[in-house]
A protein has these predicted regions:
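Active-site-adjacent structural elements in enzyme catalytic cores
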Residues: 1-341
């Protein structure tokens, strides 16, 4: 691909240009409150297909459709279940994707052969302004090469997407740092497919019932299994280095790193730990603070690439609350290499 890529401020002129490109069936990278995304008109199958080419994304990985509010759902979904209405009232606009029965107007390319579609209502003013200016619901995955860490600023988008799409809107750093929570309301019970800033506990409170948790959140998806949500693929969010997640105390972590000094490893650790380890380190947030970890995890994984690291040992976060989202991204970055110390 050899497309001239322009980076523009996310001001009125930039938003107008983005809207024009979307209406023409082109791609635009833009900020959301979670991570930067690559947008295409969700009703234009040819435009949506360009996302898969730009990212090198497998065709069996469905896309999320972004709208400003429930009034845009006509034709995109065939029904809005009661559970979806409860979740939209509680969390939208915001970092939540709700899987609903697919409608006739959404491009088949968005859905990977499924009879469902993920719908999100972003709260970021730039994303909302582009939807309103273009009149398009847009399909948008994260704006990175497939399998790499998601970008949280325009420079990281440019690193991956230069020459692959015509426009990147620079809206500064993203607020949350990990992708949206994905929950399905199709079937007998609601099911969490991807953790994010809206936690399992948040969902259960809003719905007043237990939410099932997909095994794919914390385990490798079996070969040939149907991918029902973005973020379920085997290896994802990964830097170039071989990452191994070490689950234990700091003392156990340090002892393991010291014992493997011959590998010349680097470490992905919590705030304040780097100076105690004696090897190159990147810190990804305060221990026990899921929000801080989520805000920095993808930028930290990209920093490992910038250092040229080959072997990385990573501190393991908690596996509940908001930290579940961080753990979910890290085990995929590590291709499920986890050592219990």
């Amino acid at each position: 691909m050899n497309i001239k890529t322009e980076v523009r401020p996310a001001d009125a002129e930039g938003i107008a240009r983005a809207a024009e490109l979307l209406r023409q069936g082109e791609l635009v990278a833009l900020p959301t409150e979670t991570v930067y995304g690559i947008a295409a008109d969700a009703r234009n199958g040819e435009a949506v297909s360009k996302i898969f080419v730009a990212k090198g994304r497998p065709q069996d990985n469905p896309l999320i459709v972004h709208v400003t509010g429930p009034e845009m759902l006509h034709g995109l979904v065939s029904e809005v279940p009661e559970r979806a209405q409860l979740l939209m009232a509680a969390f939208c606009p915001g970092p939540l994707t709700i899987i609903m029965p697919r409608g006739p107007e959404v491009a088949a390319e968005c859905c990977a052969g499924l009879d469902t579609v993920g719908i999100r209502m972003p709260s970021h003013p730039v994303a909302r302004a582009v939807i309103e200016a273009s009149g398009c619901a847009f399909a948008a995955p994260s704006a990175n090469l497939s399998g790499k860490p998601s970008p949280t600023n325009a420079q990281d988008v440019f690193t991956d997407m230069d020459g692959r799409l015509p426009l990147i809107l620079d809206g500064g750093e993203c607020d949350w740092g990990v992708e949206s929570t994905v929950v399905s309301v199709v079937g007998e019970k609601p099911t969490l497919f991807r953790p994010g800033h809206i936690t399992l506990e948040d969902l259960e409170r809003a719905l007043g019932e237990e939410v099932d948790v997909s095994k794919a959140i914390l385990e490798k998806l079996p070969e040939g299994a149907v991918v029902r949500s973005p973020g379920m693929k085997y290896k994802h969010y990964a830097p170039k280095a071989d990452v191994t997640l070490l689950d234990g105390t700091f003392e156990q972590f340090k002892a393991y790193v010291d014992a493997h000094a011959a590998e010349r490893p680097s470490c992905l650790c919590f705030t304040g730990e780097a100076e105690k380890l004696g090897v190159p380190c990147v810190e990804y947030g305060r221990e026990g603070d899921g929000a801080d970890q989520a805000r920095h995890i993808f930028r930290s994984l990209r920093a490992l690439d910038e250092q040229g690291d080959a072997v990385v040992y990573a501190r393991c976060p908690q596996k509940d609350g908001l930290s579940m989202a961080v753990y979910n991204r890290l085990i995929r970055a590590a291709a499920f290499r986890v050592i219990e110390l």
